[in-house]
Amino acid sequence: MHEMEGSAVPEHTYRDAGVDIDLEARAVRALIDKLTYRRTGAFSMLGEVGHFAGLIDCGSYVLALAVDGVGTKMLVADALQDWRTVGIDCVAMNVNDLYVMNLEPVAFVDYIATDSLSPEKMAQIGEGLNEGARQANMNIVGGETATLRGLVKGLDLAGTCLGVQKKDLVITGEAIVPGDVIVGLPSSGIHSNGLTLARKIVEECASYDTPLPNGKTLGEDILTPTRIYAGVLRVTEGCSIHGMCHITGGGLLNFRRLADYGFSITAPLEVPAIFRWLQETGDIDGAEMYRTFNMGMGYAYIAPPRSVATIESAIPGARVVGEVAEEPGVWLRGIDIR
């Protein structure tokens, strides 16, 4: 991708659309800094708050919790009056965070906050939640629905997922070393991040009925559900994996959550049509795109070179996109995108 020249459309950024990643990081850190209490005795916490999932020590096993939501993708579903796939997104955003640590999702609860209830909308959301649970082989054991008129406008869909794994099989990223390779896995599209910026561009410059070169409309493409990377756990059973990364909000900057090394992307995966359209129409800087969206890579392995053949043969579309370097940072073709 590249910066567009000569466009009459003002350059768009995620911050201008209302999401300041740097401010969000500072705000989250301010919250985490106050979470100092740790349980004593059995079932203590392993590691620190801030990884993709939180771990609880259960002897030879660990339990893990992840929480996430669909975000403003719900507003696109509202615009199209189609909520059938947002439940898949909700499940995916949670289970993919568990897969990063080689955890098996086993149970899920959803949380719906809304200003008004619609049985039709709830049925469609339930359809997607059930399909997501099927893909992840996971139980949905309950949930909470809150009607909060005056506090909520629209509907916010989120969930919490419980995972489990033998303690000695958990992957935290601590084994990552310079010289490891980064193997990218294709996304299904925009997934569930960067929608605030995407919606701003669509609503200012086009419509959800606008066709893309891939034969879909913008609305159809955006509502394509987040890919559930259930197959990644099979790979960890057969070869050495030092770390994994779910490319969500913040794009490539998610690699910084794994280790204090450099992550250099030299050969990115093919960029889907939706991202090319957003960049060209919104006149978005290339680095800004990779700081905001997954850009076609929704998940990645960090592994020694000897593991590449096993990964590529097991996961369709997986291939080497870069490597780990000594100097901390995240680079895209040599450009520091921090």
Question: What residue spans do the PLM features occupy?
Answer:
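Glycine-/charge-enriched secondary-structure boundary and capping motifs
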Residues: 2-5, 10-18, 27, 121-139, ...
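Acidic/polar, glycine-rich intrinsically disordered N-terminal extensions of enzymes
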Residues: 14-38
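A generic structural signal for residues located within well-ordered alpha-helices
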Residues: 19, 23, 86, 193, ...
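Glycine-rich phosphate/pyrophosphate-binding loop regions near the starts of catalytic domains
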Residues: 32-188
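Short, acidic Gly/Pro/Ser/Thr-rich loop/turn segments
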Residues: 70-74, 166-169, 190-192, 250-252, ...
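A structural signal for small-residue-enriched, beta-sheet-centric alpha/beta enzyme cores
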Residues: 182-190, 244-251
